[in-house]
Amino acid sequence: MTKKILLNAFLFIAILLASALMLLPAMLDKSMNPVSEHAPFVVSVEAQELHGSLIVGDWHADSALWNRDLKKAYDYGHADIPRLQAGNVALQMFTTVTKSPSGQNYDSNESGANDNITALAIVQRWPIKTWSSLFERAMYQANKIKDLEKRDPENFMLIESQYDLGIFLLKRVNNPKMVGGLIGTEGSHALDGNLENIERLYENSFRMMSLQHF
């Protein structure tokens, strides 16, 4: 009887933990990346026409850090393909987040401080190799963006060269809603202290590296 009670208790705890791991990533994402509700902005016809005539580019989005399908529209977070299209954003730089020290601030950060991304990677069930390697974290996030192009080629194109950019702009003439994406690093933590990783990142579609983040 005691064994049966213990087994049932173990199963209950296991189910509870599994449920928490399934729900926690989205809960964290929604709490840390809310979108403020507001009344519709008043935009003049002239401003709308001007905005619609521009090739708009945004150079920072941490969207690949989170467990989201960027093909879908969300009511939280920075960006996804439907919202980029709605805002007439033609080019989006997807930056890979690999390290964020506990207590991060604008004045002073300790290099030995606990890293927030490690816990987030574990909670979001990233591959084990990303738990200890900043380079692998960058690669994992970049692969999400490359996979997005494979799954949604009508709406998204990864740009890796000047030639790609030209092709993208031609495609956008017939499909004004197409979004072009680039991949970059947020800070150079992804090098993991090894300059040879610059070449490895380039070979894996990275085209921008910010030298410092904090």
Predicted regions and their residues:
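N-terminal hydrophobic targeting/anchoring segments and the immediately downstream early-domain regions
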Residues: T2-F214
